[in-house]
Structures are given as structure tokens and as C-alpha cells.
């Protein structure tokens, strides 16, 4: 029986039985909002969806909405406060006046993740979080579990922050499904009860501080991924991350450590490590040695260690893991080749929305000062100074764009030349005008995309389109 846990408002955790006769409010008509509204409507709930954007901006999205769902657009009216519970979109601040009033009125607010999982029948949940690497790791782990599920006659889904809402995958009809979920701090902070069989925290460095308000609050959000596990569950942690080591004392489940350090093999507590370019796993009293996926950088070796170790904990066989590794393709927008123009190699790393991600990308760049670095977007409140050593070692010049440009220039112009561009298209043109064959142009923004783009995917695709346009122009000339 599930424990009686509470949410901010003091209400019980979400259970379909308890809330069945209460009207559901869904705040936001994004992917997760539409998906959870449809899920609830399909389960017989009365659903009211409220969206602050105008009808013109969300009309296409609403076409996918169940016809029984009531809607309002262009703002939130008092009708939202007549509902029995609410489901909010990820990223909506708890300082939002509507959320504050909901809590004051005693109306519980849940995440799409928690509500969706409440309808899943006996799922095997593997949940992945971390500041960086969670998309690659989730996709890798999801591919392993698809192969494993096929041998068990079960279904497998990869969902969450990768763009596939949990609610869209959960139909409640598949018993014993394997669900691999990438969960952001936004999603976790609103989940009062999730209990993965396997939880994964890859690393924790400053990010989303403008949303959470402090590093402490950000860490507390991440910890929710394991807080409700028990001794029969597993928690996979990065032994080289100091915050992971510190929080391990709060983990109620069995901890499995992975490490990329040179002496990891000598430490008996380490369950997965790298030796001679191979991945070594120690689990269940056995030792397995696998070839890593064909991906650049030590960070991807770490991602593979985490994915493989998690899969073993979930019952996958070494051969299944190896098959997934052998066939794994790079994640879009993460150190992704975008094209070559005038001998300059352009790299799309639009998913790098924080400084630590940029550090990972820079480590994968060629030696010597051959890299042009495009930074900028909406500032997230973390310093850019940690970039200085690698910038001085590898970066020829920085091109800044977006709202954060003045802040970036203030912190980094003393160690490398900085030029400001009106947008990323102009940034590409500046590099083509000043660079030379053999250089690399790395688009790794270190900022969110919301100043000019829908999301990092939109930003990355626009960047690739610009590079293609410039390459096509070169061929025509």
C-alpha cells in the first residue's frame, strides 16, 4: 500500500480513486498539458484546460485535445478556482499568482508526471535526471529497455523531458511496461510521489537558478527522484560528483556507483568504470566488459556507464546492452555536426543551456585555439567564469548573441576577444568572414533559448538551417 504523503497544500498524493469525482484543472496547453488533459478525459474525468496565451497562438495545439475538455485561452479566469485539483505545466513558477491562489484555496497542484504514472499498471519505472547528459542517457537506456522488453513480451517507452510526455505513453492497458523517463528539476519539484525501481542522478551543477531561487532548492528538487524509493529499489549515482556523494546519505534504496576516474577499479564500492577504453560493470556478483557507443567525449562514456548500470539493475542482460550501444546514434542538438562551410566545421550544441554543458563540449573540441564559440540567449543566473580556463586553451574568439550578451562579455572579454552579433545567423557570417579552413564553429549557447526561440530544439534547427543556407550559397558561388 502506498504511504500517505502530502503535497504543498496539505492534500493527499494523487490517486485516481480519490480525485475521480473532482474536476481537473490543467494549466497550460503545451505538449504535456494536452497529453494529461486527454489522459484524464479518457479516464472519465471532467477536465478544464486554462492557457494564458491567446487562441491564435495555441489553436493548432488545441486541435489534438479531447472534445470533452473545456478550454479557456488568453488568461486565467476565476473558473480555475472551482476545480478540485490542478495539473501544472513544467517550468511554471510557484510564484505565479494563479498557483499561489490555488494553494491558498487548498486546491492541490500536481505534475503531469505524477498524474500520468498513477494510471500506469505495474510499470517498471526507470527515472533519469542530472544537470547534463540526461537526454543522451535516457535515450540510451530507453533503447536498451526496448530490446529487453521485447524478450519479455512487454512494452517499453522513453518519455519525459525529451519531448514525449509521460501522459501520452501511459494508456493504463500495458501491464509490466518498462518506462524510461527523463525528468527535469521542473518536473521533479512538482512530483510529491514518484517511486522509480531505478533512479539515476548523473551530476548536479548550477542551473535553472532563476527559477528555483537557490542552489539548495535546485538540489532538493533533484533529490525527489529517489526520496520515495525503498530498499528494494536502486539509485545510480556519479561517484565523481561531489553533490551526488553528499546526497547519498539521504538515499533509501541500494546505491550503485559509476566513475570515470583512473583508480575506479581499485575501489570496491564502484559498480561501473572505464578500463582501456572499455566499459566494465560489476553487478550481482559478476563482472561484464562491454564496448562503448561510438560517441565523442568522456562524458558520453559516463552516460553509457550510467545507462548500462541502470539497465542491469532493471534486469537487462549484457548482450542486450551491447546491442543497444552498437546501434546508438548521437542525440540531436548535442555536439552534432551541422555542416562544413569554407573548410570550417560547424557544430550544433543548442542543448547546452548551461555553462557545464559548454565545458563538456569544449573538452571534445580539437586542441589549440581553433574554436569559435557562439554563446548567448536568455541568462540563467549562473556565472560564466568557469569557462575561462578552457576558453583560454581552445577558443579563438567568442561571438555573443541574445539578452545575455552583455553579461557574457563582461565576464569573458578579458581572456579572449568577444564580438557581438544581432542573431545566430550573423554570428555564422562573422565566423565565415574571419575564420579559416580547419577552424571549428561551436554553437554552445550556455543560455536558455526563450529570448528568441520556442525552445532549444527550435534554436538548433534554425542554426542548422542557417549553416545549410551558407553551405548552399558557397556551392552556388
Predicted regions and their residues:
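Phosphate-binding loop of NTP-binding sites
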Residues: 4, 39-42, 79-81, 90-239, ...
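Short beta-strand "acidic-cap" motif of Rossmann-like dinucleotide-binding folds
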Residues: 47-51, 158, 180, 257, ...
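Residue-level signal for inorganic ion chemistry
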Residues: 40, 86, 128, 161, ...
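Nucleotide phosphate-binding/pyrophosphate-handling subdomain across enzymes
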Residues: 15-23, 34-43, 288-395, 413
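Beta-strand->loop->alpha-helix junctions that form or flank phosphate-binding loops
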Residues: 51, 72-75, 110-115, 159, ...
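N-terminal leader/targeting and accessory segments in enzymes
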Residues: 2-111, 115, 410, 473
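Short internal beta-strands
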Residues: 46-53, 235-239, 372-375, 394-403
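C-terminal helical cap/extension that packs against the catalytic core
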Residues: 59, 63, 68, 385-439, ...
